[in-house]
């Protein structure tokens, strides 16, 4: 043991002396290095345990020492003020050379370093990838993955050129909060090789898709781009069909909300990812297709301009697009709004439309058309309705909405299209929406006004038997609360499909005063059921009178009040009481999907 006036400096482990930090008789403060040892190719400072002056050294540079070996002896004493100032003062604003180099490299890929590319983007009426992500995520919450990668093309271009011209390999991606909720966000960068999918970019996607799966994070993807990139010559491959991105992304379906945004040209692999999303948001200038002009021409299918491949007018009407918006700014707003329905109750004060208005929205004249969207808007919290796929399956309205801040899904018949009859497209639209709601624990309200399924030779050529079957199979297997309100017509199998397969399947089935019911269209039922009686009447005028009398009796028998009196529905209600039924029967809401360990459904059907 050294005397109390001395401090021993010993080796904490075996190593080699590579430097002497303080020589005798230099003063040294507590915590300052006396000797530097190297062990396992790492340098370790051996520090003084107390202030003092170096009295003697027991080792020299190059010596090998054992653990516990004496290295130096200090005489206890206070280090000089100069020594303290020299060793303790650190300018926290100083940027070291290594950090400066990292910052410089990051800056190369930012919009500020690429003014020409940014200008071209703005001239075309679009924003950059980074501008879109900055608009989407909450300020100060975004962390980027893989900003330093570049295209795998060093066999044909210089590294400096690739760093400058292919930043992030054309895919800007990371994690940030969207209205307070962590979300994986990514955008192809059309200013980099036309937004094509590079091999290193694929690895970045893979990484983030796995992060989304492990953390249960929603994904928002800006998908503009030209598909696969054949020019990544550094990557040893034949066809690249072992790419994992599409498998990993498809595995997220039904696990987390997936939002795809298309602006400009979105072809091939980019479109494949877009089409795998739960919701597709597309701008007016978008053109979406599974093959771009080069692929089309290469297949001998003619020469086409990019805008001719899958313009918004086509893709909106055929059901590819869920939300049609003017531009990228509106697309970001729509994405934020869509995601809000998957975070539970808002907790914000709500404005409730005057429920008395609902009493007057269905005409007393039973054949008069009305606006079913006015009904939807009148039932739910003001401003809370977000309609999906409005341009497709026109006889069905599918929307997300809220009652007292609680989110739910709405499926309604639109009598202005085919009188509310359900056709193949309408059935597909409703069936897919039901899967979406069930996957993420959103209760479903059906607003029924249908004469039934669309029939006839033309309808059967659209494979209605199978399309209609989807409604029954999916509806019967919903695990979320459901309810049905019959606004006017509730006829046949179509009406049953608007109740999950039958009027006893929902938690409640009620009618408004205008509701009417039948196993099939009543005129057809009378003609079929009274065929012999009607044929026996020789006088045509008398026969028609008998028919009309029977039809009137059938309508009276099928009135909502009589239906409720026979217990086939739960009640006929004042339309102004509709919200009370919804709020009461859908409370408590289903568990939050984010708390589940596994998927409820294997996936959400993309169609």
Residue ranges, per PLM feature:
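Methionine-biased hydrophobic packing positions in alpha-helices, especially
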Residues: 13, 40-42, 498
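Acidic, low-complexity mobile loops and tails
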Residues: 1-36
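Periplasmic scaffold and linker elements that assemble and bridge Gram-negative envelope complexes
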Residues: 2-9, 39, 78-94
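Ligand-binding clefts of soluble mixed alpha/beta catalytic domains
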Residues: 82-607
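Short hydrophobic beta/alpha edge segments that flank linear recognition/processing sites
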Residues: 26-47, 66-82
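Generic structural motif
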Residues: 11-17, 48-56, 65
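A cytosolic small-molecule/anion-sensing beta-strand core signal
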Residues: 13, 29, 50, 66, ...
């Amino acid at each position: 043991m050294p005397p109390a006036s001395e401090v021993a400096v010993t080796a904490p482990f075996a190593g080699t002396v590579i430097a002497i930090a303080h020589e005798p008789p230099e003063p040294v403060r507590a915590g300052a290095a006396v000797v530097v040892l190297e062990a396992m190719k790492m340098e370790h400072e051996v520090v003084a345990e107390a202030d003092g002056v170096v009295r003697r050294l027991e080792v020299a540079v190059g010596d090998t020492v054992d653990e516990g070996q004496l290295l130096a002896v200090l005489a206890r004493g206070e280090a000089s003020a100069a020594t303290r100032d020299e060793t303790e003062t650190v300018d926290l604003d100083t940027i070291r050379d290594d950090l400066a180099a990292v910052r410089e490299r990051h800056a190369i890929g930012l919009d500020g370093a690429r003014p020409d590319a940014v200008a071209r983007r703005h001239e075309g009426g679009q924003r950059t990838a980074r501008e879109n992500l900055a608009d989407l995520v909450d300020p100060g919450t975004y962390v980027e993955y893989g900003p330093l990668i570049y295209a795998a093309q060093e066999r044909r271009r210089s590294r400096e050129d690739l760093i400058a011209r292919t930043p992030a390999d054309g895919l800007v991606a990371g994690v940030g909060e969207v209205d307070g909720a962590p979300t994986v966000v990514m955008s192809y960068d059309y200013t980099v090789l036309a937004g094509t999918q590079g091999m290193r970019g694929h690895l970045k996607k893979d990484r983030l898709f796995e992060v989304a799966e492990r953390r249960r994070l929603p994904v928002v993807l800006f998908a503009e781009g030209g598909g696969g990139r054949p020019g990544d010559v550094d990557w040893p491959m034949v066809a690249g069909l072992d790419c994992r991105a599409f498998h990993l992304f498809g595995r997220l379906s039904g696990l987390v909300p997936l939002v795809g945004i298309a602006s400009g040209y979105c072809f091939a692999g980019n479109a494949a990812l877009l089409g795998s999303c739960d919701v597709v948001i597309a701008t007016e200038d978008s053109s979406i297709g599974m093959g771009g002009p080069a692929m089309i021409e290469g297949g001998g299918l003619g020469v086409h301009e990019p805008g001719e491949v899958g313009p918004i007018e086509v893709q909106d009407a055929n059901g590819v697009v869920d939300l049609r918006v003017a531009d990228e700014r509106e697309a970001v707003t729509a994405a934020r709004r869509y995601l809000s329905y998957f975070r539970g109750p808002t907790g914000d004060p709500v404005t409730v439309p005057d429920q008395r208005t609902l009493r007057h929205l269905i005409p007393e004249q039973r054949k008069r058309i009305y606006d079913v969207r006015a009904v939807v808007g009148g039932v739910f919290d003001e401003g809370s309705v977000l309609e999906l796929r409005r341009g497709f399956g026109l006889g069905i309205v599918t929307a997300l909405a809220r009652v007292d801040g609680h989110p739910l899904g709405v499926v309604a018949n639109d009598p202005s299209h085919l009188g509310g009859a359900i056709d193949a497209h309408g059935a597909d639209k409703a069936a897919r929406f039901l899967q979406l709601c069930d996957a993420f624990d959103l209760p479903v309200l059906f607003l029924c006004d249908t004469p039934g399924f669309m029939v006839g030779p033309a309808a059967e050529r659209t494979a209605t038997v199978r399309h209609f079957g989807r409604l029954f199979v999916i509806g019967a297997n919903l695990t979320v609360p459901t309810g049905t309100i019959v606004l006017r017509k509730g006829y046949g199998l179509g009406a049953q499909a608007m109740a999950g397969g039958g009027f006893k399947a929902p938690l409640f089935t009620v009618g408004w005063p205008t509701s009417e019911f039948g196993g099939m269209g009543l005129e057809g039922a009378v003609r079929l059921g009274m065929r012999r009686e009607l044929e026996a009447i020789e006088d045509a005028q008398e026969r028609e009178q008998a028919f009309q009398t029977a039809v009137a009796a059938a309508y009276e028998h099928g009135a909502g009040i009589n239906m409720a009196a026979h217990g086939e529905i739960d009640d006929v209600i004042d339309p102004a009481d509709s919200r009370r039924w919804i709020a009461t029967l859908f409370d408590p809401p289903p568990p939050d999907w984010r708390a589940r360990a596994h998927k409820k459904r294997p996936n959400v059907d993309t169609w």
